[in-house]
């Protein structure tokens, strides 16, 4: 228990004065940081740092300018250009007319600095949440509605697909490798343009329905919990689950091991006679071929079960 003299000494402390001094120190520090960032050529310095850090990897992104905005604090980047080598691919660079990085309150699960990145590509608005931790990053898309046709350049020349899909993604990355993943994607108007299969050109596939659930708890394996393609009127209907061992830097070469079933409409089989030849050795159940998908993500191979 405190003595009378100790209580008296506590009462003598001028707490209001100490609070005022602390607030004054914080205010002076804030004004110093504000003045420094307002007049310091942060854009040129940041561009130099980025180029130096990434040039050894064959990646040289560029932008016109970067500046700070203090109303709802954020960094604004204009005319961002990301060359294809930065994404470990070939082809033209990706251009973003603007990109804003908005700072949020410190995140504790996982611990790190959280940001919201707002931009657009091909007329498609994009909103990505990013947490930068000590040893990795966490990327989050919250029920993002995406127009696949507008994002075609992001997929590369070998992926042709259109329609609108809603994506909910939570992905952790450590040392440029996916450490954990939770993904849900859904579409009601998915269309695959004409494709060439062994010399035969397929008609446009109006699949309409797409539903995907995938998780990953240990790299590089991604577990496909559910993959449903095509509604009752679609020329192709399929239902699969299984696993993909994702190859870092070359996703197309990722080995597949999916099991499920697939069915084709009569009109589609007549338009593409090779279908009957390809699946003549497969068992059928209720009009669906029982299939195991092997091969790779870029070149899947149907195998009879």
What residue ranges belong to the model's regions?
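Terminal hydrophobic membrane-targeting helix
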Residues: 35-116, 120-126
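Short, hydrophobic/aromatic-rich segments at coil-to-beta transitions
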Residues: 110-117, 137-138, 219-226
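Intrinsically disordered, low-complexity segments enriched in Gly and acidic/Ser/Thr residues
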Residues: 204-274
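Flexible, solvent-exposed coil segments and beta strand-coil junctions
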Residues: 144-152, 217-223
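Generic short beta-strand segments
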Residues: 78-83, 142-150, 186-193
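N-terminal type II signal-anchor transmembrane helix
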Residues: 2-55
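Amphipathic hydrophobic-ligand
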Residues: 59-60, 87-101, 118-127, 151-171, ...
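Beta-propeller and related beta-repeat scaffolds in trafficking/envelope systems
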Residues: 85, 89-106, 182-221, 265-301
């Amino acid at each position: 228990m405190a003595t009378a003299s100790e209580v008296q000494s506590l009462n003598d402390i001028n707490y209001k004065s100490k609070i005022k001094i602390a607030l004054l120190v914080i205010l002076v520090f804030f004004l110093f940081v504000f003045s420094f960032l307002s007049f310091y050529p942060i854009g040129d310095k940041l561009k130099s740092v980025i180029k130096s850090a990434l040039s050894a990897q064959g990646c040289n992104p560029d932008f016109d300018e970067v500046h700070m905005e203090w109303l709802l604090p954020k960094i604004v980047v204009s005319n961002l250009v990301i060359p294809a080598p930065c994404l470990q691919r070939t082809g033209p660079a990706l251009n973003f007319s603007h990109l804003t990085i908005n700072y949020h309150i410190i995140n504790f699960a996982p611990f790190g600095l959280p940001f919201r990145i707002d931009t657009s590509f091909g007329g498609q608005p994009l909103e990505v949440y990013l947490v930068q931790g000590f040893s990795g990053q966490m990327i989050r898309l919250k029920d993002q509605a995406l127009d696949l046709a507008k994002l075609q350049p992001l997929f590369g020349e070998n992926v042709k697909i259109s329609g609108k899909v809603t994506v909910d993604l939570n992905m952790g990355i450590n040392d440029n490798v996916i450490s954990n993943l939770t993904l849900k994607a859904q579409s009601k108007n998915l269309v695959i343009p004409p494709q060439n299969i062994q010399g035969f050109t397929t008609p446009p596939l109006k699949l309409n329905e797409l539903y995907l659930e995938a998780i990953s708890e240990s790299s590089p394996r991604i577990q496909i919990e559910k993959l449903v393609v095509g509604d009752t009127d679609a020329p192709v209907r399929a239902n699969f689950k299984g696993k993909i061992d994702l190859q870092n830097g070359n996703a197309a070469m990722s080995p597949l091991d999916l099991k499920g079933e697939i069915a084709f409409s009569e009109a589609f089989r007549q338009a593409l006679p090779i279908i009957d030849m390809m699946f003549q050795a497969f068992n059928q159940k209720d009009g669906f071929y029982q299939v195991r998908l092997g091969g790779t993500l870029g070149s899947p191979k149907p195998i009879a079960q």
